[in-house]
Each structure stands twice: as structure tokens, then as C-alpha cells.
Amino acid sequence: GIQLANLYLKNYHDADRVIQSLSGVHTQVVDYLSEQVFMQLSPSVQMFLLQMSVLRKVNLQLLQAVTKHSKTQSIFEEIQQRGLFILAIDEQRYWYRVHHLFREFLENRFKATDLKQYEQAHHRAAYWYKEQGFLMEAIYHAQQAHDQVLVVSLLEAISRELVLDGRVYTLLELVKQLPEQDLSKHLHLLYDTIWVCILTHQNTLANHYIQLWHKVETSNNLILHEDQHGLAPMISLLEDDLPKAYALAQK
């Protein structure tokens, strides 16, 4: 708040009058001062900041991909020189972040004034992270862009890795957010989800996904998986078909 006030008051001589006019809780003061600081900037810098606000952390390559601005580095340096809450988060000064209060103000403004460009910025960020191999960050931005097709594609690509890393509850929470009609089109992801439910002893949920599997399975899709002989008897066991489970386990 103090830094925001300092930036705002640089262009005003009657500082006492302005300070006395401020009232309300801290967040309201921050929003008010953020608005005043923001309005002092050029339109190009304003848009740059709005686009940058969708990012939880930033670097120049990511900013270039999201903003598509020809002078990304010079504008970023200008923002730093103005003291606009850009903080380095590593010793190499490769990654930065925007102070969370200022970023929240910018992101809310961006979403309220131009939802289409807001989602487009997230979409660009999602594809940049995908190309760099940071799939969890890509999923976050794809969710914010409401690109459900990209979300489920990314999740299917990383589901096995999440299972092997022991992040099974992360996978389940993400899967639960998917429409079942999308999940049913991605059998590898559905397969991994069933295994996660089995491993975490969530039998009711496992049976739910098994029923979904049966609805969409038109052929013996289990043969697509190298560990089919482990899953097939477990499915039968959960379905209380013990003779079938025993027979499959012997194969």
C-alpha cells in the first residue's frame, strides 16, 4: 500500500489531501491506489500488464508468447524501473512474479473488461507450457481458458506420470472436474483413473468409472495396456465376480 501510494503521489503536489481522502479496509485502499497507478501508464503498458497478470510466474520467453509484443524486453524493463511490483524468484533472475495484490487487481480488471482476450492469454500460456513440457502448469492455464479439449488431452499425457510419482489424489481431483463425456473419449486416462481408485480403496468411485468404461467399451480395449492382467481381475473383484477374478488372475 505504501509503495502504491508513493507511485500515485509522484504526480501530485497536494499529498496530504489525497491521503486524507483514503478510507476503508486495506484491500479497498490497494485497489484504489492500483487503479490510480494503472491509469498513469500508457495504453500499451496497460495491456502488457493485463496480459502478464494471467501468469503465476513469468520470464521473457513466456511473456513474448503471451503478449505477442515486439518490444517485450524493453517494456518489461520499463515496468521494473517504475517499481511496479515485479519480483525475481530465482538467483539467476530468470523467473519473476508480480506481487499478488497488484496481480489480483490486474487480473480482475482484465477478466471484467475483456474476457475474450483474457482467455486467449491463458490459452497462449497453456501452449507455451505444453511445448516446454510443464504439463501441470499447462493444465492450469487451459482450465482458465475453458479449453476442455486441451485440458483432457494434457491430463491424459501426464496421468501415468502422476500415478508413478504418487500424486494420485491430484489426478483424481483433476479428473473429477472433467465432464464424463470427455473422460469417456480418453480410455487411457479412464484406465489410469480406475487404477487410482483401486489403489486408494475408493471402491464406490472405482465401480462408477468401471460402469463408464463398460458403456464406451466396444472392443477388448484392455489389451491396449501392458498391465491388463492386473487390472482385469481387480475389476472383476470389485464387481463381486470372484470366479472370473480368479480365472483372470491365473492367465
Where are these regions (language model features)?
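Short, amphipathic alpha-helical segments that act as regulatory/interfacial helices
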Residues: 2-13, 53-56, 64, 80-83, ...
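Internal alpha-solenoid helical repeat scaffolds
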Residues: 180-251
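Generic structural signal for small/hydrophobic residues in well-ordered secondary structure
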Residues: 1-5, 49, 99, 122, ...
